[in-house]
Amino acid sequence: MIKVGIVGGTGYTGVELLRLLAQHPQAEVAVITSRSEAGVAVADMYPNLRGHYDGLAFSVPDSKALAACDVVFFATPHGVAHALAGELLAAGTKVIDLSADFRLQDAAEWGKWYGQPHGAPELLKDAVYGLPEVNREKIRQARLIAVPGCYPTATQLGFLPLLEAGLADPSRLIADCKSGVSGAGRGAAVGSLFCEAGESMKAYAVKGHRHLPEISQGLRLAAGKDIGLTFVPHLTPMIRGIHATLYANVVDTSVDLQALFEKRYADEPFVDVMPAGSHPETRSVRGANVCRIAVHRPQGGDLVVVLSVIDNLVKGASGQAVQNLNILFGLDERMGLSHAGLLP
């Protein structure tokens, strides 16, 4: 059994990680930390986990207890993993970080977007960006894995086939993305209140969202050149889900884009390229570690529209983290993640 530690288990990504690991036949959660909830039983805080984690309680973070684990997940706000990851890595413990702390390769760029100096720039050379569809082989050898964000996952998976094949004009990419309210986290905030978010939709961070440099970094690597991306996120009145509508101009209209996408993702267990003409729905991936994609070329012109949907808490966070765990420890990549989405 893989001995697992979790730092920060009281947010939505933390409880989702617990839910997924409860169904994992090769993982055992030995330590879960929370300074604010130390001493509280996991099953008391999350009744949906009763019968799965009886006897496990939140504890104050203890470096020795965490270092005794085979792998530690960080489901924390940005900056926390900076302070603890180095000590764990030195002890031989693997680290899978769900925060943004190690996603960007440039420490100065990270500081610009997150409003504070990067706390562990010396570790960036060891960090592997945990998008399995791109970095599977690097993940196998990793010590420190940076799990991609939710918007970056849906957007990159939608654009990758076009950019890798050199078919899209990389200077004019548009990502029009919608997210459920759980993407804002569990903390109390006026914008997340039911009366504020219900029956309404709005764009936000149009000037620049923290996920913009992460998406741009991945797309630039895929294209092999600089890219121009307009990324506009929206808050929608649903709990879970990301719907990304992606626009690109293709340079060769003779290419069969459906075949291109199907070939690119033919061997990917968690990317579903839907039949031509499909319109994937967020409800089809709720609770599942799947990205569903459809590609369109309206009126047969040179503008391509890619529709990409994920559950922001699963393929956009905790499910992708478990997928990385499986790859890292040489397990079947689908282990503990084969459940279907929830309907209705």
From Swiss-Prot:
Keyword annotations from UniProtKB, A to Z: Amino-acid biosynthesis, Arginine biosynthesis, Cytoplasm, NADP, Oxidoreductase
Subcellular location(s) of the protein: Cytoplasm
Family annotation (SUPFAM superfamilies): Glyceraldehyde-3-phosphate dehydrogenase-like, C-terminal domain (SSF55347), NAD(P)-binding Rossmann-fold domains (SSF51735)
Top-rank EC class of the record's enzyme: oxidoreductase
Any one GO BP annotation for this protein: L-arginine biosynthetic process
Reaction equation(s) it catalyzes: N-acetyl-L-glutamate 5-semialdehyde + phosphate + NADP(+) = N-acetyl-L-glutamyl 5-phosphate + NADPH + H(+)
Superkingdom, natural source: Bacteria
Residues spanning the signal sequence: none
Disulfide pattern: none
InterPro entries for this protein: AGPR_AS, AGPR_type-1, NAD(P)-bd_dom_sf, NAGSA_dehydrogenase, Semialdehyde_DH_NAD-bd
Functional pathway: Amino-acid biosynthesis; L-arginine biosynthesis; N(2)-acetyl-L-ornithine from L-glutamate: step 3/4
The EC number(s) this enzyme carries: 1.2.1.38
Gene Ontology, cellular component aspect: cytoplasm
Keyword NADP belongs to the record: yes
GO molecular function: N-acetyl-gamma-glutamyl-phosphate reductase activity; NAD binding; NADP+ binding
Active site: 150
UniProt-listed NCBIfam families: argC (TIGR01850)
Protein family membership: Belongs to the NAGSA dehydrogenase family. Type 1 subfamily.
Stated role: Catalyzes the NADPH-dependent reduction of N-acetyl-5-glutamyl phosphate to yield N-acetyl-L-glutamate 5-semialdehyde.
Protein name: N-acetyl-gamma-glutamyl-phosphate reductase
